[in-house]
Each structure stands twice: as structure tokens, then as C-alpha cells.
């Protein structure tokens, strides 16, 4: 069933809303560093938030190109790359991350952009402070 009110919509789309704000934060740092694009490690279909439809919803908030070199890779290929570039050990640390915390019982594979934007409108009062806090407390790791 589809959520009928904004609170229910917000709950159902929590992960997508979070991913959209993560994209905004990433774009902030990319602009600050003079980058012309973002690069992510997403792979199509690995998780519910990485369907083509949901990736388009995530992209919608970003004003620069988003490249996904792992888009067609399977999990083992991505693990091999992570080991090669030195990010694998960090990726398996036993901490709850945003995706773990916001896992819905029944993940949405085809988000509704109109409802997501309506839910985001209800967050505007607090989100600016939270984004500033996230930006100010971000640790930048340079990968070679």
C-alpha cells in the first residue's frame, strides 16, 4: 500500500530522503574542492535503494554529473576493488551506518518523487542545521 499522509510517506521513504541529503552534502564538498562530478560505488540492484528508478530520484537533487563505475559489477568485484584501494577494512567495521538504521521492513524499490519532496518540505526547518553539522563534522579520506 502507498502511504497516504506525509508522516507515513516520510517513514517509508526515510532511506531515499537520507540518500538525497547525502548527495547534497557530497556535492557541497565536490564544489568546495573544484570537482566537476561525483563518483559513487553504487551497483544496480544490489539493494532496494539502488534500482534505476531510485538512483534517478537520488540524482534529482544533484546539479553535477554522478558517475557510478561499479554500476554493473557484482558484490565480489566491488570487494576486490575496495581491497585494492584500501577501503575494504573500513567498510566492514561493525558500526551501524545510516543504511542499517533506516532499513525499512519492506524497502521501496520505486520511490515516488512527489511524495519524497513533500516529506522533505516538512524537514526544512531542521535540515539546514543538520546539514551544517554533518558538513562541519565530516572526515575527508583521500583514496589513491
Label for each model-derived stretch:
Residues 1-9, 13:
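Single conserved hydrophobic/aromatic residue that forms the stacking wall/gate
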Residues 15-85, 130-143:
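Active-site adenylate/phosphate-handling loop in enzymes that bind or generate adenylated species
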Residues 98-113:
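A charged, well-structured terminal subsegment
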Amino acid at each position: 500500500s502507498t502511504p497516504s499522509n506525509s508522516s507515513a510517506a516520510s517513514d517509508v521513504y526515510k532511506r531515499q530522503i537520507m540518500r538525497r541529503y547525502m548527495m547534497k552534502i557530497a556535492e557541497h564538498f565536490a564544489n568546495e574542492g573544484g570537482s566537476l562530478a561525483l563518483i559513487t560505488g553504487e551497483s544496480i540492484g544490489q539493494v532496494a535503494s539502488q534500482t534505476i528508478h531510485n538512483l534517478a530520484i537520488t540524482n534529482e537533487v544533484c546539479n553535477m554529473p554522478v558517475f557510478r563505475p561499479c554500476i554493473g559489477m557484482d558484490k565480489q568485484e566491488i570487494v576486490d576493488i575496495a581491497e585494492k584501494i584500501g577501503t575494504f577494512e573500513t567498510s566492514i567495521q561493525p558500526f551501524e551506518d545510516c543504511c542499517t538504521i533506516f532499513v525499512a521492513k519492506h524497502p521501496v524499490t520505486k520511490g515516488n518523487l512527489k511524495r519524497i519532496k513533500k516529506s522533505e518540505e516538512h524537514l526544512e526547518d531542521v535540515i539546514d542545521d543538520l546539514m551544517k553539522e554533518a558538513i562541519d563534522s565530516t572526515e575527508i579520506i583521500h583514496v589513491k
